[in-house]
Design a protein with these regions (language model features):
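C-terminal catalytic core of Y-nucleophile DNA break-rejoin enzymes
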Residues: 21, 28, 110-131, 140-164, ...
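Short, basic (Lys/Arg/His-rich) helix/loop patches that form interaction surfaces
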Residues: 41-54, 70, 135-142, 150-151, ...
C-alpha cells in the first residue's frame, strides 16, 4: 500500500521546550566561517592518519554542515535513512554560486511535530560526499551511523568532537553560551531570515509554525525590514529606480 516498514527506531528523551529555539545562542557568521575552515583541517589525512578515526571526524563534519543547511532538528537528521534522500538538483543561487539542492523526506515517526514533510534544501554535496566514504548506504541504513552501522552516531561521540571543534575555533565558553548541535538549526533559520526568505517558507522547511517563527525570530524580521527601509534613502537620479 505504499508504506515502508522501518525495522528500528531510536529515540532519546529530550528536555527542549518549544520556546528554546528562539532563546538559544547561535553563531555569528564569522564564527561559522571559522568552524567550516577548522573542519577542513580537522578531517585532513595529514593530521588524522588513522582511517577509522578520520571517518568518524568526517561524519561529524558532514553532520554539522547538513544541520546548518537543512534546518532539520538533530533527532530528525539522526533518524534519516538513505531511502529518505529522494533526489538532487544542481542549481545556481541568486548570487551566481553553484549549489546542490537535495530533496529529503522527514518521516512523521521521526519528526517532533509528528507530520511528514518533504523539503528541498541546500547541502546536497555533503550528503553525496557522505555516501562516498560511509560503509552503510543501503536504503534502510541511517545516514549518520556508529562504527558498526547498528545505531545512530552516538551523542557521546558527537559531543566529544564538538568540544574539540569549539575550542579549535576559539569558543572556550561554548557551554556557557549554550552552543550545541541544535544551535546549527537556529543558525540556519537565522541566516534564511536575514536573507529575506519569506517566513512561511522558512517555517515549512524547518517543520514548525509561522507563528512560532514570528514569535521567536521577530527581531530578525524587524532587522530585515529596517535594512529594506534604509534603501529608500539613497539619492535617486532621474531615470533610476529607488531600489538599487
Amino acid at each position: 500500500n505504499g508504506y515502508s516498514h522501518i525495522p528500528k527506531m531510536f529515540f532519546r528523551p529530550i528536555k527542549i521546550s518549544r520556546d528554546d529555539i528562539g532563546k538559544r545562542d547561535t553563531f555569528t557568521l564569522d564564527e561559522y566561517d571559522e568552524m567550516v575552515k577548522f573542519l577542513r583541517t580537522y578531517t585532513a589525512k595529514k593530521l588524522c592518519p588513522d582511517e577509522e578515526q578520520r571517518t568518524e571526524r568526517q561524519k561529524v563534519r558532514d553532520y554539522i554542515l547538513t544541520l546548518s543547511n537543512t534546518l532539520m532538528r538533530t533527532g530528525e537528521l539522526r533518524q534519516l535513512t538513505w531511502a529518505d534522500v529522494l533526489g538532487y538538483e544542481d542549481r545556481v543561487d541568486m548570487t551566481g554560486n553553484k549549489v546542490c539542492l537535495v530533496q529529503l523526506r522527514i518521516r512523521k515517526e521521526t519528526s517532533k511535530v509528528r507530520r511528514t514533510r518533504i523539503i528541498w534544501v541546500r547541502g546536497g554535496e555533503y550528503i553525496k560526499r557522505l555516501k562516498t566514504y560511509s560503509s552503510f548506504t543501503e536504503p534502510t541504513d541511517l545516514l549518520f551511523t556508529n562504527r558498526t552501522g547498528t545505531h545512530p552516531l552516538g551523542t557521546r561521540e558527537l559531543y566529544r568532537h564538538w568540544d574539540v571543534v569549539m575550542k579549535g575555533i576559539g569558543i572556550e565558553d561554548h557551554s556557557e553560551r549554550k552552543l550545541s548541535f541544535y544551535s546549527l538549526r537556529h543558525f540556519g533559520i537565522t541566516m534564511r531570515m536575514k536573507s529575506g526568505v519569506p517566513i512561511a517558507d522558512v517555517a515549512s522547511v524547518a517543520g514548525t509554525s509561522v507563528s512560532h517563527i514570528e514569535t521567536h525570530y521577530r527581531h530578525i524580521d524587524d532587522d530585515v525590514m529596517k535594512e529594506t527601509g534604509l534603501r529608500n534613502f539613497a539619492p535617486v537620479k532621474e531615470g533610476e529606480e529607488a531600489f538599487g
